[in-house]
């Protein structure tokens, strides 16, 4: 497995250290709908007009269903398993949110490029789709407290391992996913690198496998997982740019829901919920060595 070519120190530099807390039990499924089919329709009057585009906390509780945007093709964070059920790190968290809200979770499949749109149009109440916090995004949506650390990384075939973005060959294409921090970062910091853009994680992975680009830039957690799960690939750049955090997002101005999520994240930190989430959904991919570097408990990143 080519993941072994990445030093632990290099990986940690891209992810940083986070504070840890205490313990937790797994979330129950009785208060959430895990079927992929359940995400095909949006529950409640989410898409209202004007400033009422979002549903408040009380409106969500009254409806009995919370619409949560998650990935359906990004294993191990959000994906649909062989039984048609949503699984992954973000989904595990989403089910707990729904349970503690006392409502059912209606999962709505999202792509990276439409996460903001789905909030702005009221298609979802919450985005839990590996959403990296950036100043630009914070102008359009409201982010809750973080629950994970992340940086960017670059994966490429063993036959031509990319270890630097300097002196780039103008004929070589870099694969990115539209709407991701990788696209934004490369466009700004490396404008001379041609970008081959795709709408989903599945199509980006297929593009790399088919040789449509020399490398794929994305969250380092994602490219490391890809290299571990697919022989013949190496993460030659495990840390690119600065360390960032991943957090839930709600529609701009939805303070009642935002405040509730922040309080929930703090409360879950007292139970070490996200360590439990990691051990249930991510440990097979990243192992136990990186748990404390990836997990953010109680919203206290870099504490």
Regions found by a protein language model. Give the residues of each.
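Extracytoplasmic small-molecule ligand-binding "clamshell" domains
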Residues: 49-130
